[in-house]
């Protein structure tokens, strides 16, 4: 009998038990470290929607590495290849955002994230946070977690920023502004090659996968209008906050709406964005 087989027999009662034990060990080891494998996208069913060239990840849409800011300020969250759903709700691989302040990623991705000032939970499906920190350097991270606050391997790069001044007596409403939705990119007037990314944002609204029908939540709907053809309607019922598109060449008007997950009404409408799509 080969030496390796003898060692296996000495460690377990049978070859089957050995292989089962080995599989469990490998699975546990894999679960402890973030995966570098590209996640299969959960895409809305439309022929113009294409998979993201990026892996599933969180990111800040309005903050820059090395940026200097006065507080309070608004941090806006972006998410690739996943959707949002409030805490306590299950919808595929959707989750909710967490903002980590001066904290590394957890060592154990199988334990719930703590609740404190350095692990801030956005369990309603929010896409932004009002951040009010004293002057100094900070490292910010985004981390997506499931219904029980157990993190996915979906997170942002660490973002190093400096707070230069903390303004006192500032009301949250004056910083946050009125509730609205926006197309963050592309900008109106841009001419793009395919595929291109369209980023959505909701201020003052909670985003969710439509399936759980959570009250006070909604999802994005994008209508693409082109002269001489019927409008194309893309429903992001999975709670997605961005998409990659490959439409036919031409000029388009993008109209983004926020749709209630309980009654299907239009809760908010963004300013239209006019773009051109050309060949490479």
Please annotate each region the language model reported.
Residues 14-27:
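Bacterial N-terminal signal peptides
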Residues 29-36:
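Boundary at the C-terminal end of the N-terminal hydrophobic targeting segment
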Residues 45-51, 74-80, 88-167, 188-189, ...:
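Long, low-complexity serine/threonine/glycine- and acidic-rich segments characteristic of extracellular
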Residues 1-13:
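N-terminal secretory signal peptides that target proteins for export/translocation
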Residues 21, 57, 96, 180, ...:
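A residue-level signal for beta-strand positions that form part of recognition/binding surfaces
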Residues 36-70, 164-193:
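Short, compositionally biased P/S/T/A/G/V-rich stretches that sit at domain boundaries
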Residues 4-5, 33, 129:
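Intrinsic disorder/low-complexity segments enriched in polar/small residues
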